[in-house]
Amino acid sequence: MSLYRDHQALEQLTLGKTTLYRDQYDASLLQAVPRNMNREPLEIFPDNLPFHGADIWTLYELSWLNNRGLPQVAVGHVSLNAASTNLIESKSFKLYLNSFNQTRFENWQAVEETLQRDLAACAEGEVEVALHHLDHFNNQPISTFTGECIDDQDIEVTEYDFNRHYLQNAAQGPQVEEVLVSHLLKSNCLITHQPDWGSVQIHYKGSKINREALLRYLISFRHHNEFHEQCVERIFSDLQQLCAPEKLSVYARYTRRGGLDINPWRTNSEGFVPATGRLARQ
């Protein structure tokens, strides 16, 4: 399901089309998708965002040449502010990174600065970039989401089409503050309909949310077609509207595709800080 599958902003995307791979730096390969495309149907407007947050990208396949032609490799972390005008389409991001492969840069800082400049221009917003040598990750364990997993419920599931109404009247319990986790989030690319696999962490303070209803709601994304960032904002919006928590944070970490993973988080709590460690499937 998608309300904007044929939106004009999607017509020029390379996603889902045969493309040539370039190995010389080309910033024009980056393509933007307006965030308001999915936000307007959710009644989310840029002058009054109900959340703050970011899209955290991990760049696993990043290589360039130093000024003597010696290949360099790094793992990159990019944080794109959720208040930016656009999100960055992931296939175009991959093609853009490939264009670094045979391009010479003076030093690592030049690569960071190039990435930051180009991504900020494409997104029309704030971007933070950090590149890491591979030994930075020595002895770093696989991380887990903190919180209570809701996946092992003894329920029968027969419906997999998106349905926000599972959350209707789902918050009837006592006042609590808790962190819930599910690894059963699966949605599909808006354009190609390829599956996107993720884990989601929901931290809220408010009336206790029925866990069966919440799990059925998350499972209903299984046939849903949207980009990662849009799914997280939809989850946030639906929980906020239908469960009305006092505080809410939604954070999803998706498995990688094309050497990239995308990990969006949205919160209305000033105290929320997303953990950035890789999960088991990443």
Curated annotation (Swiss-Prot):
Catalytic activity: 7-aminomethyl-7-carbaguanine + 2 NADP(+) = 7-cyano-7-deazaguanine + 2 NADPH + 3 H(+)
Record-listed substrate binding positions: I88, E89, S90, H228, E229
Pathway: tRNA modification; tRNA-queuosine biosynthesis
Binding site for NADPH: S90, K91, R257, G258
Pfam families hit by this protein: QueF, QueF_N
Tagged with keyword Oxidoreductase: yes
Top-tier EC class: oxidoreductase
Keyword terms: Cytoplasm, NADP, Oxidoreductase, Queuosine biosynthesis
Gene Ontology CC annotations of this record: cytoplasm
GO molecular function: preQ1 synthase activity
Cytoplasm in keyword set: yes
Record's subcellular location: Cytoplasm
EC number annotated for this UniProt entry: 1.7.1.13
Active site feature: C189, D196
GO biological process, any: queuosine biosynthetic process
HAMAP family found in the cross-reference section: QueF_type2
Similarity field: Belongs to the GTP cyclohydrolase I family. QueF type 2 subfamily.
Function, in words: Catalyzes the NADPH-dependent reduction of 7-cyano-7-deazaguanine (preQ0) to 7-aminomethyl-7-deazaguanine (preQ1).
Assembly and interaction partners: Homodimer.
Name the record gives this protein: NADPH-dependent 7-cyano-7-deazaguanine reductase
Organism, as annotated: Photorhabdus laumondii subsp. laumondii (strain DSM 15139 / CIP 105565 / TT01) (Photorhabdus luminescens subsp. laumondii)
Protein encoded by which gene: queF
